[in-house]
């Protein structure tokens, strides 16, 4: 927060009575308010823009050499934990991509560690040259039909609003509780309103009629549109619509046609969940901008969606524009087609130049670890058995690069009254093992789409309750993979049919995050993918993030929890067998 002296100094710079800290000359400024490209000097004082016009007196003069000057990009909805690195490391990845602000929902770590997890994320982000605003998790757990690590009722959340970086209530996922008028979720919404915060939606699978429930209680955003019709429905209902392009949720190409000259001010961009390797190779919000431009969105409109629209969406009044009184978060672009970045300023300081970070701007941190209690009993093959009385079963139909699944009915192989995986039919066994309270609960189901030839994969990243989830071609391989990630205190492992571990990634922070530099995490993810390709014929998708979302019951159609097979349409556990 600024003080009186800083405001007085900024005013003095704006009218030429004092020197600026920095003046940027010869840039072509993208005005996100008028949609114009303008010329003028940008005077910066104490991390804020003091004015745009004719300025020469400064401690430092920077020549933009005709490059385009745009505001720092804003990711309107992201789960940092999906990158499997800490917030401090996340900043190191995002800033070269021009992202200077994120709005995050730390519900992944909250599902494991409760308030302590949220506080850890806020503390770790301190000192990083990235604004990380937090929306408090609204749905921990996501539903009542599973075990997670902690439950966050309204009373537990309310004190966290005192933190200056907490700005609202995160995606309200438990739609049935909203529709029923559940006192806990409505109290959370009331508390957010009292604190002046926004309330994010999660309208996966909701019809235009269902949206009335959302809007009636004050939910004002949504990021779950998977096609243009859904995006328009949300727009017409009065929502800000976030167009998502992540690792699994790749929806931008299906939704971008909803954007028009008349309505673009109500659209912004988000990544939601994106792995570190995709952030490095594709980018973050800069990638969303490029995709939009490639699909006939005007470049300035796309930049508005990535900046001022996102700031307006979350009521961040001093972010999202290159204008007097705004935070000096500035990106230099070589052109407005490829969005090639040459320089990034955060609070008026150069943090990235020609792709290289100014490492002095990034604090070095070693994160403490939250290690969930290990499963006390050694998992056996018997825990993974799936008894059947007939051979027609509900099967989770995995869709590549899509968070939705299909509710399939398939004839499966049964031997001695138990399900047997079929490599030929690509009908594999999936299991979710509770890891937080030593309940011994194991949900077992059948999944199609992973193409395993042998072996198994297991991970403690399993949205949103983050139990252990595994998929395998045999019980023996699954048993080995599950016990291995348990013994290592959280992480991901790929094993072959002999039980040999082909590659692993340790995630000691809540079983979700590495405490290593992101470069090491990227190398391990590449190793995991190489190992997966040794045991699978399936290509063209990320198997680990895909697997982690097969346990999220608040996205259609069929998912698996530690309690069993969850049907989104009825919002309850159903038998594996078709009656």
From Swiss-Prot:
Keyword annotations of the record: Hydrolase, Manganese
The reaction(s) this protein catalyses: adenine + H2O + H(+) = hypoxanthine + NH4(+)
InterPro entries: Adenine_deam, Adenine_deam_C, Amidohydro-rel, Metal-dep_hydrolase_composite, Metal_Hydrolase
GO terms classed as biological process: adenine catabolic process
Superkingdom of this protein's organism: Bacteria
The protein's Enzyme Commission number: 3.5.4.2
Required cofactor(s): Mn(2+)
An example Gene Ontology molecular-function term: adenine deaminase activity
PANTHER family to which the protein is assigned, alphabetical: ADENINE DEAMINASE (PTHR11113:SF2), N-ACETYLGLUCOSAMINE-6-PHOSPHATE DEACETYLASE (PTHR11113)
Record-stated family: Belongs to the metallo-dependent hydrolases superfamily. Adenine deaminase family.
Name used for this protein in its record: Adenine deaminase
Top-level taxonomy: Bacteria, Bacillati, Bacillota, Bacilli, Bacillales
